[in-house]
Amino acid sequence: MIDLIGIGKRVKTARTEHKLTREKLAEIVNVTPHYIYEIERGMKAMS
């Protein structure tokens, strides 16, 4: 089974280490900031 919470924590750690806001990361990967939020919280899987 996929560990969505673990993946979300790694995404957030990488984002903050690169000093990116959710908004900026969302712009870079062409998704909404809310989608980034849901990934970081383990609520959604990346596709």
Task: For each feature predicted by the language model, list its residue ranges.
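Positions in alpha-helical segments
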Residues: 9, 34-37
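Residue-level detection of the helix-turn-helix DNA-binding "recognition helix"
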Residues: 16, 30, 37, 41-42
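Short, basic-rich loop-to-helix N-cap that marks the start of a DNA-contacting helix
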Residues: 27, 42-47
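Short basic helix-loop element that most often maps to the first helix and adjoining turn
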Residues: 9-24, 28
